[in-house]
């Protein structure tokens, strides 16, 4: 049995933020969410989140995750003090405790699984995840004997000059035999410059503590300030983009592209420069996305082209062409083989198959049938200042340039709306609707001048 404890009580003053450090976002999810999800494959018996600074905000963020227990650390007196708070929650627990830091978001599940396996196989009192860093500044140093058993862990601020030459560092990830750890926790003393209870001090009280090196030292990267947050984002992006390129996705100028790890891409997708894919986005095979596009929480069908467009919370079916400079939002649904063109905004509307909205239009709260042609400058006037109203347009209908459809209004099938019309009444099938003043020409007229 394994229980997981995540240390998430600190403020993180170097972030210079009112937001708790563990709630800062990294690629669409908070740091602590990423840590929590890294241990999902372990299937722990218990998941304990140690909270302190802005505890309610942390609770609210993690509310969607089931089976979590929150442990409050009212005073932040070090990592050892944090683990002492677990004693009432694990009184009858006889398994192992995996301790994770809420600000170390790049850990892979495989690394944690390997750590636990080594711990169990060797029947260690504790097993520590370590790494050899080229530049170990800021990390505690781990000292081992010839059998990889830990003899000492020294925080950097307490290291001598000679000890600082050791490049094997403590990753802050531990697997403990809980009954043995619980027995020695009361022995911890705050006898250091920080007057804190260091969890690493338990090493001298436990029988066998082994160090295990992580395969990629970047996994243990901690986040203490905005620069480190940006560095972690780069590492995460490189992982994601490497995965998708190996899976058959073409990234043109990968450095200018960002992809959340919640995004799903099919083979033969081409992502052009300056494109950003976020949230629960799914993109079908054969699509060409970008350049200069943002797609968030949206589903894109096969063989869709998106050029300089913003698409959020929407769905685009196969064979569509979107952009340039189109904006789809608020549950817009574009059915197959449509063209949504220059400077078009579509919000909370459905556009039927093989329809065109090519230029300078706004469609809000509208339902369009199949093979509708929306002329340049057509607007649905859906808001009366109090509430929004629907517009319905039937199959094979055409709206002329600069038309205004004042909702609520229903336009039938096979209707033509004359250019420049303001339509505020329903139009039956097979009709021509004209709603504008008749043109009047005044012969011999001249504009007055000063001459």
Curated annotation (Swiss-Prot):
Acetyl-CoA binds at residues 376, 382-383, 419, 436. The active site is at residue 359. Residues 248-451 are annotated as: N-acetyltransferase. Keywords: Acyltransferase, Cell shape, Cell wall biogenesis/degradation, Cytoplasm, Magnesium, Metal-binding, Multifunctional enzyme, Nucleotidyltransferase, Peptidoglycan synthesis, Repeat, Transferase. Pathway: Nucleotide-sugar biosynthesis; UDP-N-acetyl-alpha-D-glucosamine biosynthesis; N-acetyl-alpha-D-glucosamine 1-phosphate from alpha-D-glucosamine 6-phosphate (route II): step 2/2; Nucleotide-sugar biosynthesis; UDP-N-acetyl-alpha-D-glucosamine biosynthesis; UDP-N-acetyl-alpha-D-glucosamine from N-acetyl-alpha-D-glucosamine 1-phosphate: step 1/1; Bacterial outer membrane biogenesis; LPS lipid A biosynthesis. The keyword DNA damage does not apply. One of its GO terms (cellular component) is carboxysome. HAMAP family: GlmU (MF_01631). In the N-terminal section; belongs to the N-acetylglucosamine-1-phosphate uridyltransferase family. Homotrimer. This is Bifunctional protein GlmU. It comes from Gloeothece citriformis (strain PCC 7424).
